[in-house]
Design a protein with these regions (language model features):
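A short N-terminal beta-strand-loop micro-motif at the entrance of redox/enzyme domains
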Residues: 9-37, 42
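Glycine-rich beta-strand-centered segment in the early N-terminal region that forms part
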Residues: 26-38, 52-102, 107
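NAD(P)H dinucleotide-binding glycine-rich loop of Rossmann-like/cofactor-binding domains
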Residues: 94-174
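Conserved N-terminal Rossmann-fold NAD(P)-binding element of oxidoreductases
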Residues: 175-179
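N-terminal Rossmann-fold NAD(P) dinucleotide-binding loop
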Residues: 185-186
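Adenosine-nucleotide cofactor-binding segment
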Residues: 193-248
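Glycine-rich phosphate-binding loop and adjacent beta-alpha segment
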Residues: 250-318
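C-terminal hydrophobic helical "lid"/dimerization subdomain
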Residues: 293-372
Length: 372
């Protein structure tokens, strides 16, 4: 069986390559999954931007100098050498931008398993966990695309809100969110607006102001040029989804009472830069698995997941509520389509209302008989 891998140059994200590789025979205890479809958003660009810093490149090895960007989606077991996983099983999880992947399931339960590959053991467990769709509490039949697009983003959003609340928002009551039209930003805003006394300010481009205002999750929406509409002495926290160096400099310079700078993402991939020498607090990169691990230690895994899933059900219904859903889903199949959407999202383009679902395979037959 020949597999396709979508590769990205680690030091030049605009350079990509499609490589065909021959799938090796399975050894005992492994399974081969056909990756049916996956979402691609600015969150995945952030994985690539922080690929070395936060070890995102380490999950799925690639040839020297190249990386395989992790994505979230659904796959089907098409070949199994593991006694507890049958062909045809539908699995949610963290995959490479490929047609197939081989995993080494361990700690297999009714709910799912962890990939026990040696190279993944030092990495955060939350990314190594795979769920059987048939019993997954997040999963709703017919909502797979919404789940793939928003589930990992909402988990990050929930944990950002939880982390800041856990820190009493560092004494701030004004929360500045960049790239306010991004899905992770507005998921975070939905959670933050439930906190009493918080001024949740969405910052976006002029073209996206109307969209952000239509969401109803921000106290107010401003363009990047309108920072002067927020009091310079406001006790504030900057929650950065853009990674724009000029914007960060402007915020640190204007807000003398900036309490915390929380870097979550990098939707403005071409406008990154150094934060050295800025006034105010040091930039703190938010790593969702670290907050998840803290809460699992305090509440247990079931306690954490129960809280997130309950809020997820409310959020996903809100996003898809007629007659004006926040999200329109587009399907894209084949290498050329994947390359086009990758380039568009990397450049920060596209309609914020649109969510992209991708399949690298040219046809279902390329994935195997059991794939959907």
């Amino acid at each position: 069986m020949n597999d396709l891998d979508f590769l990205v140059r680690k030091d030049r994200l605009t350079e990509t390559e499609l490589r065909e590789v021959t799938g090796a025979p399975l050894t005992d205890g492994r399974v081969r999954l056909a990756i049916d479809r996956f979402s691609f958003t600015a969150n995945n660009v952030s994985y690539a931007a922080a690929g070395d810093t936060l070890n995102y490149w380490a999950f799925f090895p690639a040839p020297e100098g190249w990386g395989r960007i992790p994505v979230w989606g659904f796959a089907t077991v098409v070949e199994s050498a593991h006694p507890d996983l049958a062909t045809g099983e539908r699995i949610w999880g963290y995959y490479p931008m490929s047609t197939h992947v081989v995993l080494e399931p361990e700690r297999v339960s009714r709910h799912g398993f962890f990939d026990g590959a040696l190279h993944r053991k030092p990495l955060f467990a939350i990314y190594n966990q795979y769920s059987r769709c048939s019993v997954d509490s997040w999963h709703t039949d017919g909502w797979e695309d919404v789940e793939a697009l928003l589930r990992p983003l909402f988990a990050t959003s929930w944990l950002v809100d939880d982390f800041l609340a856990d820190q009493a928002f560092y004494g701030a009551d004004t929360l500045l969110l960049s790239s306010a039209s991004s899905k992770t930003a507005y998921g975070t805003a939905v959670q933050l607006r439930r906190r009493a006394g918080m001024d949740v300010v969405g910052l976006t481009s002029a073209a996206n102001v109307a969209f952000c205002e239509s969401l109803g999750c921000y106290s107010r929406v401003l363009t990047y040029a309108q920072l002067d509409r927020v009091a310079a002495d406001a006790a504030s926290v900057y929650i950065d989804f853009a990674g724009n160096a000029d914007l960060r400099s402007a915020i640190h310079t204007r807000f003398a009472n900036l309490k915390y700078d929380c870097a979550v993402g990098a939707t403005h991939i071409d406008q990154r830069g150094s934060a050295k020498g800025l006034p105010g607090p040091r930039v703190a990169f938010f790593f969702a698995p670290a907050q998840a691990a803290k809460r699992i230690g305090e509440w247990g895994e079931a306690g954490l997941m129960g809280r997130i899933v309950a809020d997820w059900k409310t959020f996903s219904r809100q996003v898809m509520s007629p007659p004006a859903p926040w999200l329109t889903i587009e399907q894209h199949r084949g290498p050329d389509a994947v390359q086009a959407i990758y380039a568009q999202v990397l450049a920060g383009g596209g309609d914020p209302r649109v969510g992209h679902m991708l399949t690298l395979a040219r046809s279902l037959s390329d994935l195997g008989d059991d794939a959907r």
